[in-house]
Amino acid sequence: MLRFRSLGSGSSGNATLVEAGNGVHVRRLLVDCGLGIRQLDARLAQAGVAPGGIDAIFITHEHGDHIGCARAFALRERIPVWMSHGTHAAIDAPDFDGLLRVARDAESIDLGELQLQPFTVPHDAREPLQLTCTDGASTLGVLTDLGHATAYVLQRLAGC
């Protein structure tokens, strides 16, 4: 089963929890990590998720309300972080201690029970990506900041 929960939205910080799987095998993805680390910990606790229960982080773009505590949280919990090359080049955090993974437009990311499909969007950032998430039965489109809906964006979200 595919589930999502907004942990924060807006200029004070964006974070979305996406979960896939049954009660025994659950994959958890954090899309954006724009909150402060204590606030993120508290909101994960409210959702019944331990910080170490996150399997991956996907950063959509380099703006502070999306990237916030991503590096500190990833390093503390040893969680891989996916972002575009352009996003990584735009931030002042070159070292993710081997946890950085490069996400590319239309290249699938396999997290076991959860598959991600990043896609480019128009936005005032260096190389912003949004994504769809699927568990094989359902598909969720995650769209945070978007300049406007292009034909490509609509194509990528078809079926969500």
Predicted regions and their residues:
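Structured catalytic core of nucleotide-sugar glycosyltransferases
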Residues: 2, 6-16, 61-70, 74-75, ...
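Active-site metal-binding motif and surrounding structural segment of the metallo-beta-lactamase
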Residues: 37-83, 159-160
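Metallo-beta-lactamase
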Residues: 83-137
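Structured loop/turn residues at beta-strand edges in well-structured enzyme cores
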Residues: 49-52, 98, 114, 155-159
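Conserved Rossmann-like nucleotide-binding pocket used by diverse enzymes
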Residues: 58, 117, 142
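Conserved beta-strand hairpin/beta-sheet module of binuclear metal-dependent hydrolase folds
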Residues: 1-47, 127-145
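Active-site-proximal loop/helix segments of hydrolase catalytic cores
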Residues: 141-160
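A structural signal for the main folded, soluble domain(s) of proteins
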Residues: 3, 29, 52, 98, ...
